[in-house]
């Protein structure tokens, strides 16, 4: 049985995993790998700390919903209508860095390494944004992701939003298929040489739908 509920702080490790997986998509290395230059365990711990930071960034636990299958965490995503949560990212990363003993010199390199992401960002003003979608491999193709997305669309509708949007790495066909199954359609894509050189995907594709 699939149950969808709001995330809680104690879900932090799973939410961090979802954020890490979403940033990696279909690739072997994602934004966190490139920025942090650590192994997977290091990146996952950093991501976990982002979700429970005081700074309410787009990684914060309070923005997430999770889907459980018979009481087991299976999928997560976050959604928001206020893009100011993106601007809290540096503060959240600073908190995570301090907590992991990362010195200021190393932390200063994070945005230099990760700035390529800005080249391909696109957004529709006033739309509800869905981010950090992650589903455990054993639950992919079972309807869990669709149930979670449908729940998020309803949440956005109740909040008064008329449109929702979601972006992902170009080439992540599995994600695109899942999003199209709940009514999302192509809206825009951006490509940039520096983006592809850094991560191996030509850019980001954005889908949108009315709600």
Model-based region annotation:
Residues 37-64, 68-69, 115-120:
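Active-site rim helix/loop that mediates acceptor-substrate recognition in acyltransferases
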Residues 83-127:
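Conserved acyl-donor/pantetheine-binding loop and adjacent beta-alpha core of acyl/acetyltransferases
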Residues 23-51, 97-102:
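Conserved GNAT-fold acetyl-CoA-binding loop/helix
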Residues 3-17, 25-30, 82:
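A short beta-loop-alpha structural element at the N-terminal edge
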Residues 141-154, 180-181:
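Conserved acetyl-CoA-binding loop-helix of GNAT-fold acetyltransferases
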Residues 66, 72-81, 129, 134:
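Conserved beta-strand in the GNAT
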Residues 126-128, 156-167:
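Conserved GNAT acetyl-CoA-binding A-motif
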Residues 83-84, 167, 185-200:
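Conserved catalytic-core motifs of GNAT/GCN5-like acyltransferases
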């Amino acid at each position: 049985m699939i149950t969808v509920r709001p995330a809680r702080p104690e879900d932090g490790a799973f939410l961090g995993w979802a954020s890490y997986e979403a940033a990696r998509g279909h690739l072997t290395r994602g934004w966190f790998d490139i920025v942090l230059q650590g192994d997977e365990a290091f990146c996952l711990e950093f991501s976990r700390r982002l979700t429970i930071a005081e700074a309410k960034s787009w990684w914060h636990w309070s923005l997430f919903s999770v889907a459980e299958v018979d009481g087991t965490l299976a999928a997560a995503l976050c959604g928001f209508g206020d893009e100011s949560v993106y601007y809290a990212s540096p503060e959240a990363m600073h908190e995570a860095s301090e907590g992991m003993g990362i010195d200021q010199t190393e932390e200063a390199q994070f945005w230099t390494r990760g700035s390529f992401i800005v080249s391909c960002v696109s957004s529709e003003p006033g739309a509800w944004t869905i981010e950090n979608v992650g589903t455990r491999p054993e639950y992919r193709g079972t309807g869990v992701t669709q149930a979670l997305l449908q729940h998020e669309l309803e949440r956005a509708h109740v909040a008064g939003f008329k449109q929702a949007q979601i972006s992902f790495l170009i080439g992540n066909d599995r994600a695109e298929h899942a999003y199209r199954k709940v009514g999302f359609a192509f809206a825009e894509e951006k490509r940039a040489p520096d983006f592809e050189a850094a991560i191996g995907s030509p850019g980001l594709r954005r889908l949108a739908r009315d709600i």
